[in-house]
Regions:
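Bacterial N-terminal signal peptides that target proteins for export
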Residues: 1-10
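NTP-dependent nucleotidyl-transfer catalytic core
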Residues: 16
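N-terminal signal peptide c-region/cleavage motif recognized by signal peptidases
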Residues: 19-21
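Flexible, solvent-exposed loop/hinge segments and secondary-structure transition points
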Residues: 24-166
Length: 166
């Protein structure tokens, strides 16, 4: 009888401990984060692509939360190029899709939300997706920016080497 009366509280304590551990694990998730080195490598790859295609661009790389990790304007880029690249990167990250898709959605009237949510639905930015998870975005000031961003993603994250010019 005495053993049984001790087992009931011990079982209850063990159950509460297990439940607390399971709950704590449910409150945390792992998040992939683009590193400074990864963002710099993307900028370098995009710059190389732009030089091969005789373009002068600016580019911005954001992390999953929208924080600026890396930004660069090539010599001779327009005065507003950095702002344009940053706005495009923010838009691609918020909507989790290329800004060219957003542009089509807005132009056809399917969804006008990007126009009044301070987004910039102009072609030139892509979300950075690694293992199915959006870890950031890259915005490029040019209308060909998505090609440049894709080249950077391919070089840095897919390790396919230098992509050919379009």
């Amino acid at each position: 009888m005495r053993t049984r009366s001790c087992l009931i509280p011990l079982t209850a304590i063990a159950a509460m401990t297990f439940t607390a551990q399971a709950s704590a694990q449910a409150m945390v998730r792992e998040q992939k984060v683009i590193s400074s080195a990864g963002a710099r490598a993307m900028v370098d790859a995009c710059t190389a692509w732009a030089e091969r295609n005789h373009l002068t661009l600016a580019m911005s790389v954001l992390d999953w939360a929208g924080n600026l990790v890396e930004s660069h304007a090539m010599e001779g880029a327009a005065a507003n190029a950095i702002d344009t690249a940053l706005l495009k990167a923010k838009s691609a990250l918020r909507w989790r899709r290329p800004t060219s898709e957003m542009n089509k959605i807005v132009r056809t009237g399917q969804n006008l939300a990007p126009t009044f949510m301070h987004d910039f639905p102009q072609p030139g930015a892509l979300p950075i997706v690694v293992d199915g998870e959006v870890i950031g975005s890259m915005g490029v000031s040019s209308a060909d920016g998505e090609k440049c961003a894709q080249a950077a993603i391919d070089v840095v994250f897919k390790k396919q080497g230098t992509p050919p010019a379009p």
